[in-house]
């Protein structure tokens, strides 16, 4: 199943990016940071100005993101592993620039990048 999921992700054009590329998208292309972790993970620390939509709610709440359809969207999960489903939902609904942060919030913290707590 994992190999199939990987091919789906690459077929649909969802790119994995590292923290350096994510910072460039955020700073220079006004990317939306979409945090799809659960409430407790998000409260423990998240990227500044991120939008929080838990993974299991993405099917019903993706319309909240409609105004970002043509902007880059950087999807954040705990370790980067579970963010494929939300990314696929966004792609399926016409979002053109969806990126998964490789290593998720863990990679962001390892790079000593800014984190805020609720």
Give the role of each language-model region.
Residues 1-21, 25-31, 39-72, 81-118:
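Rhodanese-like catalytic fold shared by cysteine-dependent sulfurtransferases
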Residues 34:
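Active-site flanking residues adjacent to catalytic metal/cofactor-binding acidic residues
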Residues 76-77:
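Metallo-beta-lactamase
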């Amino acid at each position: 199943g994992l190999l199939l999921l990987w091919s789906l992700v690459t077929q649909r054009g969802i790119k994995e990016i590292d923290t350096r590329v994510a910072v460039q998208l955020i700073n220079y292309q006004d990317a939306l940071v979409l945090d799809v972790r659960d409430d407790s993970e998000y409260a423990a620390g998240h990227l500044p100005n991120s939008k929080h939509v838990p993974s299991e709610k993405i099917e019903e709440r993706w319309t909240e993101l409609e105004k970002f359809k043509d902007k880059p969207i950087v999807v954040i999960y705990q370790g980067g592993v579970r963010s494929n489903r939300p990314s696929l939902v966004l792609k399926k609904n016409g979002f053109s620039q969806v990126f998964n942060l490789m290593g998720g919030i863990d990679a962001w913290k390892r790079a000593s990048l800014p984190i805020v707590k609720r």
